[in-house]
């Protein structure tokens, strides 16, 4: 690792100007980086150490960089070469070469540098002083010249104006005299003596005025001429001063040259040598410190070697762990793949089973619904036909109980609909009428009772129609039935005016139908006003009071136990048909929402009619007759015989058929229960499979988390590896920068040479401009009073003492500059970037020049004051 060779790959480090590189095992320095006209892309111009190149820094007549002339003239041949970045390699010198830079060579280079710096500083200060003096003299010359020219031009203008005015006045006087002569000659014989005297007086006054103005103009002209003469004299004096000042300037230049020679002679004195020896001691101490740092760096290199070995061992172990983890991960992935395949297969089977079970479940639901419908119908028929069992033949009491049963069935179902309320109340009314007819058949009154019964059974209450509608659960409109009931009651006055029948019909209407009708109107209508709500509440309360009154009238104590009967007063014309027409027409069968309020008002009228009816009811005692008792006994005997003869066979057959149907239904229900149990078992199996799948997913997630943790550990180890590599590279870079600081010193010297050439060229241009202005010999006055006060250099001894004092101060400044300069102290323990070096170097150099300029001004002022 300590031989000359490549330090780092060029792709990892940026190549810049003045870097030492290798091109095909040839050492050289980078002098150009950029695009060229002979080929595309970025090319690197290299100045080789040996004449093994292909050109002298130019190609196709275009120069891209310069080669050292001494090298080219002494050895001959070409030192230039153009190449790409890929062929370049950084050059790292051997430790043997580095060890040759011992203390003696460093001291010699330091002495040479200090001598060059002092000479450059003295020359530069001298040139700066000359430059400043010449600039000030040029500025003063230019200002005085402009002032004088402006004054002369102003005076010339005044003289010209006065001459013009004088000529105008003369011409004006001549013209005036001619006019006077002409007027005198023309008007002399005509005018009187008085007028002539007046005119003469006027002309005399005008003449006096013109003389006064002429005298004033002449005085002004004389003053201007005097001023002009004075200015000309001043101009002559100034021109003499300029010539004298030119001679003084030459003398000052000579004195400045003598001073520069004396400063150069004194710069080689012992003080500067002592300071240089001190600087040499400092440099040796710095070199020792650098050697100590090199030893520390070598120890660090050994540590880095040990770290690298441990890192390689760790890397091998981690790679083994990685391979093991990858194999385990692949196995787990295979297991997860099998689990996923099994999961997908189970999902497919589950979906097929669910589809089948859903289809079977739907079919079973249909069967269950049909069976429930059939069971409902069978129960309805069973209960319906059980009503006939106590009777031997069809009986009105049985019909009443059948209608009552159907009313209870419709009440147990959805009673919120208006149609159900309608059917319920009609069935209640028909049941009450059939029971009343049954009572009348027992009493065998009136005469035409048979036709009335036949009409009621066939037209009013056809039980077969009601039974078929209940079995199919499809009910037709019953408005015609309601009106036919009212018509039937009107035709049969004994029923229409039967108070007991009226009360028995009104009781269920007021107890169940009216509250549900009010609730229906309240919920299914948009009644938001308080008046309507109060009306519904009052109607409900009135229905409750009416029910209480009806209960009192038809109570067991008043009717059944005592031989009393209810009658209406003859003046009362209220009948059952009139009450039912009010109820059926407007209150119950009104289906328009906007007419609900009118239906409530009709209900109020209905309640008023019931109240008036109840007020007209009276109770009278009734004498029992022998005929009625005989007829009742005969009817009972007939009924018993008839029921025993007809119903026995028919009921037996019906019971047998119903039992068979029930057995079939029970078998079907058992089959359905077994199928449902099978479906439940399959559902449990499906749930267990889903739970297994969930557990497998949880295990997979845990494995994935473990893999993520292992990958994070691997990433951390990779980062540590990367950081160690970067540290090693940084250490190598530091070593390279410590060994490459000599090249930076050379760059600094080149930059100083360039600055010196620029300053010299600027000063030469200023000298040429001053000489050109002196040759033109313009008449300008320059104030060089400060040069008149310069002392003559006759007393050599005090002047030399002061020069020695100034040289001491200059030596102190040089020591400070050398101690702060980057040439002596490059801070080798802290590697700097090249841009930073250029910036700090320029900054320190500029600050040094400013300090020197200021000190030279102070010295010149001190010299002048000393000799005053």
From Swiss-Prot:
Question: CAP-Gly domain: which residues?
Answer: 34-84
- Annotated localization: Cytoplasm; Cytoplasm, Cytoskeleton; Cytoplasm, Cytoskeleton, Spindle pole
Sorted keywords for this record are: Coiled coil, Cytoplasm, Cytoskeleton, Dynein, Microtubule
SUPFAM superfamilies on file = Cap-Gly domain
Q: Name one Pfam family in it.
A: CAP_GLY
> What GO terms in the biological process aspect are recorded for it?
actin filament-based movement; establishment of mitotic spindle orientation; nuclear migration involved in conjugation with cellular fusion
Q: Chief localization class?
A: cytoplasm
Q: What does this protein do?
A: Motor-binding component of the dynactin complex which assists cytoplasmic dynein by increasing its processivity and by regulation of its cargo binding. The dynactin complex is required for the spindle translocation late in anaphase and is involved in a cell wall synthesis checkpoint.
Per UniProt, subunit arrangement is:
Component of the dynactin complex composed of at least ARP1, JNM1, NIP100 and ARP10. Dynactin comprises a short rod of the ARP1 filament attached to ARP10 at its pointed-end and probably associated with the capping protein at its barbed-end. The rod is implicated in dynein cargo binding. A sidearm formed by NIP100 projects from the ARP1 filament and is implicated in motor binding.
Q: What else is known?
A: Present with 238 molecules/cell in log phase SD medium.
Q: Which PANTHER family match?
A: DYNACTIN 1-RELATED MICROTUBULE-BINDING (PTHR18916), DYNACTIN SUBUNIT 1 (PTHR18916:SF6)
This chain belongs to which protein, by name? Protein NIP100
The record lists the organism as Saccharomyces cerevisiae (strain ATCC 204508 / S288c)
């Amino acid at each position: 690792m300590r031989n000359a060779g490549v330090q780092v790959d060029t792709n990892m480090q940026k190549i810049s100007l003045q870097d030492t590189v290798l091109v095909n095992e040839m050492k050289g320095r980078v002098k150009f980086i950029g695009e060229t006209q002979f080929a595309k892309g970025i090319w690197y111009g290299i100045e080789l150490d040996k004449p093994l190149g292909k050109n002298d820094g130019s190609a196709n007549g275009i120069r891209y960089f310069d080669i050292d002339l001494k090298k080219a003239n002494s050895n001959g041949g070409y030192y230039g070469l153009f190449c790409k970045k890929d062929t370049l390699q950084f050059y790292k010198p051997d430790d043997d070469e580095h060890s040759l830079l011992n203390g003696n060579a460093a001291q010699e280079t330091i002495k040479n540098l200090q001598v060059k710096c002092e000479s450059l500083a003295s020359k530069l200060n001298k040139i700066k002083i000359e430059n400043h003096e010449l600039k000030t003299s040029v500025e003063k010359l230019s200002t005085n010249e402009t002032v004088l020219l402006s004054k002369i031009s102003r005076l010339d203008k005044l003289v010209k104006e006065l001459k013009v005015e004088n000529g105008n006045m003369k011409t004006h006087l001549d013209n005036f005299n001619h006019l006077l002569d002409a007027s005198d000659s023309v008007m002399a014989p005509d005018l009187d003596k008085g007028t002539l005297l007046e005119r003469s007086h006027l002309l005399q006054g005008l003449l006096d005025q013109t003389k006064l103005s002429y005298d004033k103009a002449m005085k002004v002209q004389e003053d201007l001429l005097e001023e002009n003469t004075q200015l000309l004299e001043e101009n002559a004096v100034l021109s003499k001063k300029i010539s004298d000042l030119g001679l003084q300037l030459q003398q000052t230049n000579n004195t400045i040259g003598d001073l520069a020679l004396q400063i150069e002679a004194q710069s080689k004195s012992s003080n500067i040598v002592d300071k240089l020896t001190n600087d040499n001691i400092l440099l040796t101490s710095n070199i020792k410190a650098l050697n100590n740092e090199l030893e520390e760096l070598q120890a660090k290199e050994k540590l880095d070697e040990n770290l690298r070995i441990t890192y390689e061992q760790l890397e091998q172990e981690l790679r083994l762990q990685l391979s093991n983890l990858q194999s385990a991960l692949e196995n787990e992935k295979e297991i997860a793949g099998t689990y996923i395949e099994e999961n997908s297969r189970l999902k497919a089977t589950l979906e097929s089973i669910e589809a089948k079970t859903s289809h079977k479940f739907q079919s079973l639901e249909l069967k269950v619904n049909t069976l429930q419908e059939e069971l409902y119908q069978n129960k309805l028929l069973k209960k319906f036909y059980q009503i006939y069992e106590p009777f031997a033949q069809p009986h009105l009491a049985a019909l009443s109980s059948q209608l009552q049963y159907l009313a209870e069935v419709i009440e147990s179902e959805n009673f919120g609909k208006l149609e159900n309320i309608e059917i319920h109340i009609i069935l209640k009314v028909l049941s009450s009428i059939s029971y009343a007819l049954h009572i009348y058949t027992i009493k065998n009154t009136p005469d035409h009772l048979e036709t009335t019964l036949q009409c009621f059974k066939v037209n009013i209450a056809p039980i077969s129609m009601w039974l078929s509608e209940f079995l199919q659960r499809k009910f037709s409109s019953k408005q015609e039935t309601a009106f036919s009931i009212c018509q039937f009651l009107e035709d049969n006055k004994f029923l229409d005016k039967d108070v007991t029948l009226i009360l028995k019909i009104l009781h269920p209407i007021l107890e169940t139908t009216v509250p549900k009708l009010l609730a229906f109107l309240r919920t299914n209508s948009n009644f938001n006003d308080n008046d309507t709500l109060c009306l519904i509440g009052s109607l409900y309360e009135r229905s409750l009071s009416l029910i209480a009154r009806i209960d009192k009238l038809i109570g067991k104590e008043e009717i059944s136990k005592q031989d009393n009967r209810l009658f209406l007063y003859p003046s009362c014309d209220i009948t059952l048909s009139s009450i039912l027409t009010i109820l059926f027409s407007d209150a119950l069968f009104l289906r328009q929402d906007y007419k609900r309020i009118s239906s409530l008002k009709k209900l109020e009228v209905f309640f008023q009619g019931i109240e008036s009816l109840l007020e007209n009811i009276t109770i009278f005692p009734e004498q029992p007759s022998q005929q009625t008792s005989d007829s009742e006994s005969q009817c009972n005997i007939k009924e018993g015989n008839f029921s025993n003869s007809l119903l026995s066979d028919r009921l037996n057959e019906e019971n047998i058929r119903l039992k068979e149907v029930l057995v079939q239904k029970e078998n079907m229900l058992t089959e359905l229960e077994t199928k449902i149990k099978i479906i439940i078992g399959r559902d449990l199996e499906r749930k267990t499979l889903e739970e297994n799948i969930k557990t497998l997913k949880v295990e997979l997630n845990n494995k994935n988390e473990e893999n993520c943790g292992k990958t994070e550990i691997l990433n951390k180890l990779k980062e540590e590896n990367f950081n160690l590599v970067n540290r090693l590279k940084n250490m190598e870079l530091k070593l390279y920068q410590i060994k490459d600081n000599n090249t930076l010193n050379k760059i600094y010297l080149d930059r100083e040479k360039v600055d010196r050439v620029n300053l010299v060229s600027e000063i030469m241009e200023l000298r040429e401009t001053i000489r050109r202005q002196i040759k033109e010999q313009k008449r300008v006055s320059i104030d060089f009073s400060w040069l008149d006060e310069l002392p003559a250099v006759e007393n050599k001894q005090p002047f030399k003492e002061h020069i020695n004092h100034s040289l001491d101060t200059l030596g102190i400044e040089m020591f400070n500059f050398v101690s702060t300069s980057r040439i002596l102290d490059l801070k080798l323990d802290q590697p700097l970037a090249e841009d930073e070096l250029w910036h700090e170097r320029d900054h320190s150099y500029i600050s040094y020049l400013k300090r020197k300029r200021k000190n030279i001004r102070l010295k010149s002022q001190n010299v002048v004051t000393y000799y005053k």
